[in-house]
């Protein structure tokens, strides 16, 4: 089935179809989240962090930012299967986070297949460098940074953290991070992908459309190297964890196939390397928690996850934190 479907159209055409579907869902999600957004959060839209191609960040801040000291900053990498999405996709959620006393920076990056791995990681690094250089202007504490992401964004965030904290991985990847490991206080990961080889080989076969989608997304992101098992393993976050990896807050829905195939195995890898992990999973919940459930703020589990995220940032940003 996969071969037949893929033979009908190119990866480029297929990913455009997938991106259109994802963007429709994203727009609905954005409008729903806007209902929960506090009205008086300060927003700086479309601040350029890279000139060619021009890419921007949005910065969300509490209304009393001028009276506050430099604050912890959550740098959010949006999802969309590496082929779609927008930095505005969860703006209501970012306002909720900012209203709790943090900076939130949402990063724009280029999409596959026009821009393939590792372009997105390089662009995240450029964004972090920009924030570091302009920290004073935006009340950012450059030593209290958090990388956050949902879905493919969680993949990018977790991968960047591995490059930052594993010098061998960075060297073989020819990657020189702009920040130091001690500056990254933690990761916030929702519904992510941490093992690309496993992602390709555990897509539910009974759901042919999902299997077809996984095939095309990975082909797009990797430059059509989906069949190269060793390459997929070599760029999987789970293969490069060390005890120096930052503290992790990780969540996934009870009806998201990625929870069982990606998030839970990743938690085990983190624990094997003595990485501090805060988990937010709800296997016994009666709520139907699908992919990206954390943005569905009308659900009790989503509210709990949000509250625990705030606690995670507060606890890990204390001066006594050593990671």
Which residues make up each language-model segment?
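Alpha/beta-hydrolase superfamily serine-hydrolase fold, recognizing
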Residues: 8-323
